[in-house]
């Protein structure tokens, strides 16, 4: 799942591959790969599909990253996860957290609620939609936590931290802790409650992160994100 092809090349976009290839040689990634293969061999259903585990990076090359949104782990229901945090394929019902994200988007920028939950439009503009854990067993939220993904995605964040003027949109305590080492002197850190129905009224609604993000990007001479979903 981590590598593919007869030469065991990592199925990863070139700019990310150049940065992260050494990680795939580390023992923890070898152990993670063995774990995933073992789970599949035991007949367990793993989400997202293997070719979508790295969709966040494959959709948003390193040099294009302007914004980072951090999730915890993929949706564990059939057909939901496709490699982008909070996002689902176009033909899948919009999950509750994403419904609330859309509500805030409309309140903040006046953008009508999109008809689908696919966030590839954001990803293609430089919004890295990164889950901390990149796989999950069907029906078992958090089942692939502490298997190595967190260390891998920590490395991704550390590489992005080397860039300048990136916006980190951190929703909930988990995301805030994940990005604790980000250099606040050159990046914009936006924190609020998580958009889950359990916490959205505790500070997510009204956070105006979408407009604040674009205000920052504009101030740095960086083209803003068009948040409309196509």
Predicted regions and their residues:
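Generic N-terminal amphipathic, Lys/Arg-enriched alpha-helix
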Residues: 7-20
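A polyanion-binding, active-site-adjacent surface
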Residues: 22-170, 174-177, 182-183, 188-191, ...
């Amino acid at each position: 799942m981590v590598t593919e092809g007869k030469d065991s090349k990592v199925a990863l976009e070139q700019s990310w591959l150049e940065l992260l290839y050494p990680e795939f040689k580390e023992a923890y990634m070898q152990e993670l790969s063995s774990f995933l293969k073992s789970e599949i061999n035991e007949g367990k259903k793993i989400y997202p599909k293997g070719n979508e585990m790295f969709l966040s990076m494959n959709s948003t090359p390193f040099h294009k990253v302007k914004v980072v949104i951090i999730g915890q782990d993929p949706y564990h229901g059939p057909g939901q996860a496709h490699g982008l945090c909070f996002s689902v394929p176009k033909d899948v019902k919009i999950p509750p957290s994403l419904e609330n994200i859309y509500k805030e988007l409309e309140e903040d920028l006046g953008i009508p609620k999109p008809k689908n939950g696919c966030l590839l439009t954001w990803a293609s503009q430089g919004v890295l939609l990164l889950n901390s854990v990149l796989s999950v067993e069907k029906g078992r939220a958090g089942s692939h936590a502490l298997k190595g993904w967190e260390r891998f995605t920590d490395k991704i964040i550390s590489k992005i931290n080397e860039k300048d003027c990136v916006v980190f949109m951190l929703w909930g305590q988990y995301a805030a802790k994940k990005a604790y080492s980000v250099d606040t002197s050159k990046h914009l850190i936006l924190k609020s409650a998580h958009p889950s129905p359990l916490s959205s009224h505790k500070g997510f609604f009204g956070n105006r992160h979408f407009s604040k993000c674009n205000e920052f990007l504009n101030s740095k001479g960086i083209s803003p994100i068009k948040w409309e979903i196509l």
